[in-house]
């Protein structure tokens, strides 16, 4: 019993409550100063995981829309590419040549989009599962 009381006394201090899976909780960051501007994605169906490209544009996985979107940071416009049926892109990254690689969470693939040509290719994941980022 004395050991338990000693342990509880050693652990005494402020208790933390709340939180999130992403490590950011309300009030955790200092006040952000400046102007925030938002642009709605043309297909607002679970747009997620934005990633910058080497051209300065932002690429976005539109999971439920089965598309990849690009936001042109100069013209402030969007372009979208359809993906193979059921791909449901979960996440993406853009390589140094500007090729977009995405995980096809819905059809068990790793996909490749060349934004210059619009060509999309996909490869079955060895596990056959639902790949994530």
Q: Which sequence ranges carry the predicted segments?
A:
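Conserved beta-strand positions in repeat-built beta-propeller and related beta-rich domains
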Residues: 58-64, 100-106
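Short loop/turn segments that connect beta-strands within beta-propeller blades
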Residues: 72-76, 114-118
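Hydrophobic/aromatic beta-strand positions that recur at structurally equivalent sites within the blades
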Residues: 29, 68-71, 110-113
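Sec-dependent signal peptide recognition
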Residues: 2-8
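Beta-rich, blade/repeat-based domains predominating
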Residues: 42-55, 85-99, 128-133
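A short helix->beta-strand "capping" segment at the edge of beta-propeller domains
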Residues: 23-45
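Hydrophobic h-region of N-terminal signal peptides that target proteins for export
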Residues: 8-17
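A short beta-strand motif characteristic of beta-propeller blades
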Residues: 37-40, 77-82, 119-124
